[in-house]
């Protein structure tokens, strides 16, 4: 859903490479907004789009209104890509888009090269010892890469190296 309350038609992305990401403004991964904006600026003319879906399900790290979130991102990271209304990505009220995305690409662990991976693993394992056995979104800034034909080709956890994300985007463009 767009911030103005109108439905987003996914067919408007037909023929484009799309990175779908659940975000938060008060998260340790929030600085990834700078990387996302750099990717968007570099590749948007080549048919690349970012679909930013703020979410408050992980540590309450997106507490502000939709308008405040957009203002924060634009002022602090210069974001120019589309930001949707805040939404759930897990559970009874999750967006149908996320039900589909998770059915296409499940969780395959955190990038062990990232210093935050063991922190996230402990946090999640303490809450649910079997957290890694389902496809649910584990934290903010989980990304799904969709090709021009609408196929989900990759799932990147928030700990993934953004250089790898860029490499996969380039392969699809």
Task: Describe the function of each predicted region.
Residues 22, 46-65, 80-91:
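Thiol-based oxidoreductase modules, predominantly thioredoxin-like and allied folds used
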Residues 11, 16-18, 25-55, 73-77:
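Conserved helix-turn-beta segment immediately C-terminal to the redox Cys motif
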Residues 31-34, 63-64, 95-96, 167:
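Generic recognition of short, well-ordered alpha-helical segments
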Residues 72-74, 78-159:
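Thiol/selenol-based redox catalytic cores and closely related redox-interacting motifs
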Residues 28, 58-61, 91-93, 152-154, ...:
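Short catalytic/ligand-binding loop motif for oxyanion handling, primarily in non-cytosolic enzymes
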Residues 153-173:
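Non-catalytic, surface beta->alpha helical segment in thiol-disulfide oxidoreductase systems
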Residues 1-11:
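N-terminal "domain-start" segment that seeds a small globular fold
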């Amino acid at each position: 859903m767009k911030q103005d309350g109108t439905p987003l038609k996914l067919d408007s992305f037909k023929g484009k490479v799309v990175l779908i990401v659940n975000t938060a403004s008060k998260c340790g991964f929030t600085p990834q907004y700078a990387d996302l904006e750099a990717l968007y600026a570099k590749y948007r003319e080549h048919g690349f789009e970012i679909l930013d879906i703020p979410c408050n399900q992980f540590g309450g790290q997106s507490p502000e209104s939709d308008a405040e979130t957009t203002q924060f991102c634009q002022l602090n990271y210069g974001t120019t890509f589309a930001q949707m209304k805040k939404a759930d990505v897990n559970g009874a009220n999750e967006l149908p888009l996320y039900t589909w995305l998770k059915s296409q690409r499940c969780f395959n662990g955190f990038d062990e090269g990232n210093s935050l991976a063991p922190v996230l693993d402990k946090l999640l394992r303490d809450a649910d010892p079997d957290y890694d056995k389902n496809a649910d979104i584990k934290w903010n800034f989980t990304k799904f890469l969709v090709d021009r034909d609408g196929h989900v080709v990759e799932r990147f956890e928030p700990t993934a190296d953004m250089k790898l994300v860029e490499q996969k985007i380039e392969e699809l463009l």
